[in-house]
């Protein structure tokens, strides 16, 4: 066994006769290729999970900002609703006063004329 290669119990030891079993070498090379492919896929998955975490943090921040904006919008909408209610009330009071004044202007001369 060569001292430059670390011991791996799953890899059979290399025989001194390199051409003795080419089938075994092909299988070993294929297994190593599959392992390398799997390691690459796992690294990609880990990177994607990290990116997903960053995006989730960004989305969470945006959701918080949206909730704050929604509260401000709700307060503004309530303020406008109250302002419009007061404006409508003032308009109704003005119309009521105009109707009362018109009735007084019409009824008082009639009552004075017939009395």
Swiss-Prot record:
Vesicular topology ranges: 113-115
Biased composition (Polar residues): 17-28
Ranges for region Disordered: 1-28
PTM summary: Palmitoylated by SWF1.
Pfam families: Synaptobrevin (PF00957)
Keywords: Coiled coil, Isopeptide bond, Lipoprotein, Membrane, Palmitate, Phosphoprotein, Transmembrane, Transmembrane helix, Ubl conjugation
Record-annotated membrane-spanning stretches: 94-112
Membrane topology, from the record: Single-pass type IV membrane protein
Listed name of the protein: Synaptobrevin homolog 2
């Amino acid at each position: 066994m060569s001292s430059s290669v670390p011991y791996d119990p799953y890899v059979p030891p290399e025989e001194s006769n390199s051409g003795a079993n080419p089938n075994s070498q092909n299988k070993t090379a294929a297994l190593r290729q599959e392992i390398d492919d799997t390691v690459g896929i796992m690294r990609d998955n880990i990177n994607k999970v990290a990116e997903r975490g960053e995006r989730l943090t960004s989305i969470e921040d945006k959701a918080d900002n949206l909730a704050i904006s929604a509260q401000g919008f709700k307060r503004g909408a309530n303020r406008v609703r109250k302002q419009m209610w007061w404006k409508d009330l003032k308009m109704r009071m003005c119309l009521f006063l105009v109707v009362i004044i018109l009735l007084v202007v019409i009824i008082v001369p009639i009552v004075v004329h017939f009395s």
